[in-house]
């Protein structure tokens, strides 16, 4: 999907001094590879977040950035379902995302194995919930209700 022609996003990018880039073709891994590779050409570190997680805030993102500043090559924000909601990098090894079964409950385990095989040092943040299936929406509703009455939920 190419949202670089969306008027709202173009205005926001212009106002913030940012550049919109098309994701291009391929699976999630190929698209993340291009995004991270391009960002690392300009910046010391990059953090990629999923749009299907409502459970991170400025502190969570700050913890991810702090891990990268402490010298880790990567940081992961695990999802409750076996995937991850956040990935950050200070360096990118070839094939870090290649051949992953995106959407499977083994993505996080596979990513850990890949990091280890590539010699990357990584830090993991606390788990967060994301929204992949209909039942995840029910959990989100339960969490909102719990917050409204003063309890906590993942």
Give the positions of each predicted feature.
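Glycine/proline-rich, flexible active-site/cofactor-binding loop segments
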Residues: 1-24, 85, 91-94
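Short phosphate-binding loop-to-helix
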Residues: 11-45, 104
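Short aromatic-hydrophobic micro-motifs that form the base-stacking/packing surface
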Residues: 47-49
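Short acidic donor-binding/metal-coordinating loop in glycosyltransferase active sites
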Residues: 51-53
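Conserved donor-nucleotide/metal-binding helix-loop-beta segment in metal-dependent transferases, i.e.
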Residues: 56-81
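Conserved catalytic core of nucleotide-sugar-dependent glycosyltransferases
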Residues: 74-95, 102
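Short, glycine-/small-residue-rich phosphate/pyrophosphate-handling segment
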Residues: 93-114
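Conserved alpha/beta core of the MobA/IspD/sugar-nucleotide pyrophosphorylase nucleotidyltransferase superfamily
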Residues: 109-154
